[in-house]
Amino acid sequence: MTLFGKSVSKKLADKGFSVTKAIFEAPKFSAVPSIYQDETHQQWAVSLPGMEPAIHEYADILDCKVIENESIDVNKDMSRKDLFESVLMNPAAVSRANAGKDGKYCTSMNVMLTVKGIDGKGFVLGIPLVRREILRASRMYKLFREGADNVCEDILAMRDQADKGRSGGR
């Protein structure tokens, strides 16, 4: 029992899900999803704070990629009025866009996981990793990027394993 009820692993175990690997564990008290794997049943689960964990099959994974510096576009063609409105609406976003323009800084980094929904359409689950400017030449950037790439590799390996199972291992 944790401070706020059952632990995530206990909630998952109650649903027949056995955590064999934590692909990504979000920092405590954040609104970021955690992702767990059950290799035995070829399932994975997403847990968001305050919600019941959602269990998915490997075959539900459509794609996974790391997205960097996705923000508003501050370009030279922007009128002064448009730029002024952008600054008023979100000054931090404009500052980050300018910092990331030359490629020297990473201003945001997200792992974007595309998953098959109940209706068969894809929906995107984002895991934000970087929210402030980080110099691309820094060790911190390299650690974040390596971690993001590892999460994507693990998720895509699950998808590929499901594809092999459907095609009979060919």
Give the label of every model feature segment.
Residues 37, 56, 73-76:
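Functionally constrained cores in energy, signaling, and assembly domains
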Residues 1-54:
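Anionic N-terminal interaction surfaces
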